[in-house]
Amino acid sequence: MIEKGIFKNTFSNLYDSYKEGKKGSGNASRTGSPMGRSSNPIPISAPHNITIKSGNTSQEDMIKDTKHGLLVGRLWYTYAVNPINGDFSCTARSGIQIIENGKITGPGKSVRIIHSLPNMLKNISSIGNDQRKVIQWASLPSITPSIKVENISVNSI
């Protein structure tokens, strides 16, 4: 999708790829049933089954290098607000920790994040040397390191 900061390709499934004469990226799921196990709906392309390459910064060092921020363990309810511009909205509602002067000072409250994906990608300041599986409902897991993003506005909910 993105390689060395350059946009290379979109999510695709075999159905859309065949229509466009391209190779599928393996990012398909079926909607309309629990656990995505119905064969009735047409597969849609979705952001899952993605691997983000590790960087060289530990999560501990990212925290030490943060004056004021949040450590977010999981995002919920991520929706495209304006798909053309890449604007999205999501909720961080569990596993939030407050970072002050390079130290975790306690748990945080749920917040709403409304941002632009292109701007968020420009504001990545470090990528962790760790890897973890992230599962979106019944999808195949994505594999991602810790990612530190600067200048994200959050609203309490």
How would you label these PLM feature ranges?
Residues 1-157:
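Dual-mode signal for accessory low-complexity, basic/Gly-rich regions
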